[in-house]
Design a protein with these regions (language model features):
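Catalytic domains of riboflavin
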Residues: 1-7
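N-terminal [4Fe-4S]-dependent radical SAM core
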Residues: 16
Length: 331
């Protein structure tokens, strides 16, 4: 055959493929997610997320150390309070003795600036009803989340996390105006150097299912009045631009795998770093298929992460972070 172009020439050897790779995923771009639960003496496995745990404060530190030694530069902490500490407004979220703030403080004391300590800044784990904010009657008998009252509580939570030692706060509640309000609250409290990673395009996704086991949520119903409709694309661009205008230091798309088109579009216009969250359902599907020997666990996990990175994510929140960092170094 008389061919002018033979693309296979650049696939002939492993060295050639490495030389011509268009993207390269690095451990530093992965963020390890951890759950910390109050009132336990031993870490507890999460049944719907094989290999993941609800940590105690004592087990968290060595787990973070393993992540750091693998090359991870950022962790994201979620707190799971005692049931008796939950209330209508989630007040344990900003209690300096609450489980999440104690976990932040413990990590900062142990690791200092060695890693970026990020914390989830939302109320759903801390409210008795499991919603992401303050519930009020809309005047017609339907309970809804009060946007502005909730944002006020997010500000209290963000400042408490900064005071505990968080480098980054990460509001995930999808309330209008939350970024501007939190930035002002942090600055007023003297935390101008604490950054904000905004959950800018967070969808009302069925892929979040296993996460609710991980945080033992009391949630019933849905979050469709504040999280985005999976049918929508342009709305994400509006949400991301609003967060950038309000002062977000980083923006996020969640989930990642089924929303790579959104990741791509956001990455093309965002002047700030773009994160994507490979969520619990994505993780659980890989684990379930691998447990049945239907797929190669390592190969599929890395392919999924590389796809998210290829789409434009500068960083990826994933339950595979520590393992994937080791795999990448081996490769």
């Amino acid at each position: 055959m008389n061919l002018t172009r033979r693309p296979r020439r650049l696939r002939t050897t492993a060295a050639m493929r490495a030389l011509t790779a268009e993207t390269a995923l690095r451990p530093e771009q992965l963020i390890q997610v951890f759950f910390v639960r109050d009132g336990m003496s031993e870490p507890q496995p999460i049944s719907s997320m094989p290999g993941q745990y609800q940590h105690t404060l004592e087990s968290l530190i060595p787990a973070v150390r393993q992540a750091a030694e693998a090359g991870i530069k950022c962790i994201d902490l979620f707190g799971v309070p005692l049931d008796e500490d939950k209330d209508e407004v989630g007040s344990a979220a900003w209690d300096e003795n609450g489980i999440l703030n104690r976990a932040i403080a413990a990590c900062r004391a142990e690791f200092g600036d060695e890693i970026v300590i990020m914390a989830d800044t939302c109320l759903d784990e801390f409210t008795s009803h499991g919603h992401c904010g303050v519930l009020v009657d809309d005047g017609y008998g339907t309970m809804i989340v009060d946007n502005d009252a909730t944002v006020e509580l997010y500000c209290k939570m963000a400042v408490s996390q900064a005071r505990a030692g968080a480098h980054t706060v990460s509001p995930s509640g999808m309330m209008d105006g939350q970024i501007a309000a939190m930035r002002a609250a942090l600055d007023t409290a003297g935390f101008q150097n604490v950054s904000i990673m905004a959950y800018s395009a967070k969808y009302a996704s069925a892929f979040f299912g296993p996460f609710r086991d991980a945080v033992e949520s009391s949630f019933t119903g849905n979050r469709k009045t504040y999280q985005q409709d999976p049918a929508n694309r342009r709305e994400s661009l509006l949400e991301v631009q609003a967060d950038i205008d309000e002062g977000a230091d980083m923006v996020m798309v969640k989930p990642a795998g089924s929303y790579l088109d959104i990741v791509r579009e956001v990455a093309e216009f965002s002047p700030v770093p773009v994160a994507a969250y490979q969520v619990s359902g994505e993780y659980a599907m890989i684990e379930a298929a691998a447990a049945n020997s239907w797929i190669d666990r390592r190969a599929v996990a890395l392919e999924a992460l590389r796809s998210i990175h290829r789409a434009g994510a500068d960083m990826i929140l994933t339950y595979y972070a520590t393992e994937a960092a080791r795999w990448l170094r081996e490769d």
